[in-house]
């Protein structure tokens, strides 16, 4: 039998309404009776405890010194997404021209509007929660973990498809100038940039910046030469304006084109011209303070300019029809336009530039996937070994190796036919954009107290989401069969994450099956007075051969702790946190941490916390609830010290609405915001 405990709420008013007394401050005496746990002892998480920690001043000083690391400056960070973002111009203009014909500039202009809308969305969300993960991170802080994992699946698909398609497209551009083996060269590009990714993001960014600046020079010359050629030869543009709209295929049926179909389906194709826009949010932790917003501006502006100018320029240089026209030259459209405008030498230059910048998009995929998977691994959505870094360069070698093997295998399986992966990427990218707009709305509605540098109007969020949904329908109506391939790839990725989410349930089912099919000779033996500790995971006999190995795995998964920072001993908030952890995490160990400054003045608060922890530990026997009091200041250094002391990644540390800390602190601690 436990002791009688006092629980004191934080409010002290007593009201009487209609003769009924309602108490805002109460003392409740509760007799806590600890019943014997049922089932195997290894399933019992153990009794909660109370602990007080003092942070040595030298430890905090060392942490603050070690936190100074090399971060990406404005243009280095811009170049990484800029190659993917601006490189999409190479194929988006031709795709739009095939759908829109003479109205090609209109969908490209509409996409430029989408870019400006999403630039505000990303600026608001990421400055509020500046952690790697992009859409996954935004949804994780506004919804549940399973919903956020859907965005993670789309993100992984997006990067795999981007790397595969970009590598294939790069080799195809180069093959217009020299005869090369397509499959071997594509895999060679994936391998080369995988090795470059192993050198680290700073080294990558320098190479990316050189590629980015060279690409801007080439596109500038091409745009200007197209304008000059159009002025000197105005008949080409006039004749293009007199052509009919291209026919369209809707659900397998060929229909006559119209202005509506040209704009509608062209807009769906043009949305692929802003690919890479979301990548910067997956390595925001590697960027210096204030850089993220500048990367969006620096990448969006030239993409908007070149999309529209080249959309008009090719109509002034090349006829829509004919053997050498726009429709016939869609695989290397800009190279063909360069040949007509300035000659074969410039066509060769454009082809080489296309090869280089599309290869740079592969590098962006490596950087983005490393940031995303590292975050998923620390959040226990993917295996934790993926978050390990090599000592030499500090890069995620397991992620890079796995990404290369996956991308290279797709190149071999598809035999460099990028049609399927283009479709997979289309739905993955547009799905991510739609989910991000939804996350931005939820953040604005549910997390208004979180400080942010930018506040996007509701009209921006709604209009951006509507335009992305329209683009999804345009692609769906154009070729519904692609959705089947996307679903297959999505299911494969989602299955891996489902296994991680339900690995305890799967292991329990496996143990039950082993008891039936392979019982051990100790099936009837049970252990008495066993208490599990994390360091000595010896378990009783389970009644199945190999059962103790399975039981140890379950114990290890459940014993990984989660930390919740709590300012006040609030019954409602703590109960919500426990419910959230049970619904979204595999662990059975929750540590409530309270950081206080003065022991004497906070003595009553600490005692209330201890009582609450004991109460909830009795109420929820399937989860162990510990209370940890820490004397010091609540700041990033304290959080980092606790992370190392308790071996808990910061992404597995939770907090409520952070109204108790400043915007600068919120942006640097990197913890997850939960509860309403």
Task: Report residues per predicted region.
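Cytosolic C-terminal regulatory domains/tails of membrane transporters and channels
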Residues: 1-62, 516-676
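Extracellular loop-to-transmembrane helix junctions
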Residues: 66-69, 93-154, 161-189, 299-309
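Helix-loop-helix junctions that connect adjacent transmembrane segments
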Residues: 213-276, 282, 302, 313, ...
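C-terminal membrane-solvent junction of multi-pass transporters and transport-like membrane proteins
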Residues: 207, 385-398, 433-484, 509-533, ...
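Hydrophobic, membrane-embedded alpha-helices of multi-pass small-molecule transporters
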Residues: 71-91, 246-298, 350-363, 566
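Membrane-interface loop-to-helix entry segments
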Residues: 185-245, 296-299, 364, 422-436, ...
């Amino acid at each position: 039998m436990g002791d009688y405990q006092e629980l004191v709420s934080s409010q002290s008013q007593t009201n009487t309404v209609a003769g009924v007394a309602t108490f805002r401050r109460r003392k409740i005496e509760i007799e806590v009776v600890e019943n014997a746990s049922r089932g195997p002892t290894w399933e019992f998480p153990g009794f909660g405890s109370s602990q007080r920690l003092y942070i040595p001043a030298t430890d905090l000083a060392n942490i603050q010194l070690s936190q100074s690391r090399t971060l990406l400056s404005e243009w280095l960070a811009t170049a990484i997404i800029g190659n993917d973002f601006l490189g999409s111009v190479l194929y988006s203009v031709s795709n739009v021209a095939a759908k829109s014909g003479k109205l090609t500039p209109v969908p490209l202009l509409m996409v430029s509007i989408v870019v400006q809308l999403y630039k505000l969305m990303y600026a608001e969300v990421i400055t509020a929660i500046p952690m790697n993960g992009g859409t996954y991170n935004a949804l994780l802080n506004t919804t549940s973990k399973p919903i956020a994992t859907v965005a993670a699946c789309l993100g992984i698909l997006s990067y795999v498809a981007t790397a595969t398609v970009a590598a294939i497209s790069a080799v195809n551009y180069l093959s217009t100038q020299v005869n090369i083996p397509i499959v071997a060269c594509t895999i060679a590009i994936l391998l080369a940039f995988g090795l470059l990714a192993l050198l680290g993001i700073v080294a990558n960014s320098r190479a990316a910046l050189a590629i980015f600046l060279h690409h801007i020079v080439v596109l500038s010359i091409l745009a200007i030469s197209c304008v000059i050629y159009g002025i000197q030869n105005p008949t080409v543009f006039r004749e293009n304006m007199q052509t009919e709209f291209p026919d369209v295929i809707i659900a397998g049926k060929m229909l006559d084109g119209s202005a509506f179909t040209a704009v509608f389906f062209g807009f769906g194709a043009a949305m692929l011209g802003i690919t890479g826009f979301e990548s910067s949010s997956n390595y925001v932790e590697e960027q210096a303070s204030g850089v993220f917003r500048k990367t969006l501006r620096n990448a969006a502006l030239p993409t908007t300019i070149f999309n529209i100018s080249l959309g008009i320029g090719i109509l002034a240089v090349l006829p829509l029809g004919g053997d050498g026209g726009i429709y016939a030259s869609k695989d290397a459209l800009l190279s063909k336009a360069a040949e007509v405008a300035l000659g074969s030498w410039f066509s060769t230059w454009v082809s080489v530039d296309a090869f280089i910048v599309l290869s740079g998009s592969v590098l962006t995929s490596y950087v983005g996937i490393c940031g995303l998977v590292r975050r998923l691994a620390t959040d226990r959505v993917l295996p934790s070994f993926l978050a390990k870094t090599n000592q030499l360069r500090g890069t995620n070698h397991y992620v890079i190796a796995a990404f290369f093997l996956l991308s290279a295998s797709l190149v071999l399986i598809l035999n460099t036919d990028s049609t399927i992966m283009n479709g997979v990427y289309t739905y993955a990218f547009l799905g991510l954009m739609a989910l991000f707009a939804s996350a931005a709305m939820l953040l604005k509605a549910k997390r208004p107290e979180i400080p942010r540098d930018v506040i996007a109007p509701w009209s921006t969020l709604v209009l951006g989401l509507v335009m992305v949904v329209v683009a999804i329908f345009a692609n769906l109506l154009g070729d519904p069969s692609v959705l089947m391939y996307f679903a297959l790839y999505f299911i494969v990725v989602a299955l891996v994450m489902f296994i991680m989410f339900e690995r305890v349930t799967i292991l329990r089912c496996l143990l039950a099956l082993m008891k039936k099919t392979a019982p051990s000779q100790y099936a009837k033996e049970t252990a008495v007075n066993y208490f599990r500790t994390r360091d000595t995971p010896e378990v009783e006999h389970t009644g199945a051969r190999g059962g103790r190995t399975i039981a140890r795995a379950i114990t290890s998964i459940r014993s990984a702790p989660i930390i919740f920072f709590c300012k006040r001993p609030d019954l409602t908030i703590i109960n919500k946190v426990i419910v959230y952890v049970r619904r979204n995490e595999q662990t059975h160990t929750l540590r409530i941490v309270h950081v206080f400054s003065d022991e004497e003045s906070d003595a009553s608060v600490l005692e209330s916390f201890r009582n609450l922890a004991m109460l909830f530990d009795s109420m929820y026997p399937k989860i162990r609830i510990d209370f940890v009091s820490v004397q010091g200041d609540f700041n990033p250094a304290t959080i980092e010290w606790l992370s190392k002391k308790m071996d808990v990644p910061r992404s597995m540390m939770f907090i409520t609405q952070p109204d108790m800390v400043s915007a600068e602190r919120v942006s640097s601690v990197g913890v997850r915001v939960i509860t309403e």
